[in-house]
Amino acid sequence: MTYQHIYNIIKKKAYFDAHQAVLIAVSGGVDSMNLLHFLHAFQAKLQIRIGIAHVNHKQRPESDDEEAYLRSWAKKHAIPIYVAYFQGAFSENAARHLRYQFFEEIMQQEHYSALVTAHHADDQAETILMRLIRGSRLRHLAGIREVQPFANGQLIRPFLTVSKAELPNPFHFEDHSNDSMAYFRNRVRHHYLPDFKRENPQATQSLIDLSAESRLLLQAFDDLTKGLEFHRLNCFLAQSAAVQFFLLQHYLETFPQLAIKKSQFDDLLHIIRRQKQGIYPIKNTYCLLIEKESFAIKKIIPKTDLNREFKMVSYGDSLNYRGYRFVFSGSLTDKGHDIAIPLYSLSPVTLRHRQAGDRLFLGEFSKKLRRLFIDGKFTSEQRQNAIVGEQAGVIIFVLVGDETYLRKASKHDIMLAKLYIDKLEKR
């Protein structure tokens, strides 16, 4: 396929109609060099001016050669170029974070309204297969979007409907790390996807079609629920369980820094359905706030009293909290610990102060903590310093004075782990 054919496809989609200054992410590989040559050749017809953004990851001997070539090319064609350098311990996630942070900074500083990357149809198919293997949610099977908000403008992927085989072969640098089986994407590209294509020669297109259909399904759901006041508990709970599930998923998508596991999602949904007022920590200083008539996810401001109200310990982790050390362990051996709390779930354990209305299930009945403290003849100071532990919004233990009260387990519960508690002054 020639650049003219690609231009004809892209022009119909009007990617650049709202943009004048476009920043191109260029690595020096064949895909990004195709993008650079294409946009340089057609910038007048598209009525845009272009700039180059390049990140030298300093991981290969060729990295400096790639940078030098791109600088020379940019100078020859009078195109501005911006270069960043990776420092510190290298990982794919860290490198990606640096790249997009750098792109965002350049867009804002140099007034570019669009970032353009060279993702193509094969990248889309690989991404969908990777997410299927990882067990991603349906929402994430929608794959890579052609256009999405980014920084002060948009991120555009104009080659996303074009296969790699349809692109020309301009001068480019080969990144031999693309052949390393140490990377998941390379294993998908060189092994897993070819195996699928031997079974079904149209496997790549089938994955792309799955992505498009998933995107349409999600768009239909969003259209049908638009304007729904789902933050109001009576509105949320009036929906079917299936609609509640996707409403909460959609809401969580508005918090990109809050990537939670499926088990945590199930816990949040369970807490909302119980309608018990309170503050439930999630992660990264985010919490679920349930009030009398509504719920919301909030980011807690550091150094506030609210932030000191609770801590959360996850499976395999430990932390110190108000004079005690808490260890969430899969080991069921109690030896050497002051207290051992049996756990029948691997959900994170929230440690907090008592709240008005707190109840502990004791078997055939439950008791308010206020009454529990009165019956136990605990002092006002002991009541104030009591530690409440809960999972998924259910209190599982109360530590007050020298006593520990446990939630009565069901006969069907299976112990999966223990929470070990030790007084710090013993350490």
From Swiss-Prot:
One of its GO terms (molecular function) is ATP binding. PANTHER family: TRNA(ILE)-LYSIDINE SYNTHASE-RELATED. Ligates lysine onto the cytidine present at position 34 of the AUA codon-specific tRNA(Ile) that contains the anticodon CAU, in an ATP-dependent manner. Cytidine is converted to lysidine, thus changing the amino acid specificity of the tRNA from methionine to isoleucine. The N-terminal region contains the highly conserved SGGXDS motif, predicted to be a P-loop motif involved in ATP binding. It catalyses: cytidine(34) in tRNA(Ile2) + L-lysine + ATP = lysidine(34) in tRNA(Ile2) + AMP + diphosphate + H(+). InterPro entries: Lysidine-tRNA-synth_C (IPR012796), Rossmann-like_a/b/a_fold (IPR014729), TilS/TtcA_N (IPR011063), tRNA_Ile_lys_synt (IPR012094), tRNA_Ile_lys_synt_N (IPR012795). Keywords: ATP-binding, Cytoplasm, Ligase, Nucleotide-binding, tRNA processing. Its EC number is 6.3.4.19. It comes from Streptococcus equi subsp. equi (strain 4047). One of its GO terms (biological process) is tRNA modification. This is tRNA(Ile)-lysidine synthase. Belongs to the tRNA(Ile)-lysidine synthase family. The keyword Glycosyltransferase does not apply. HAMAP family: tRNA_Ile_lys_synt (MF_01161).
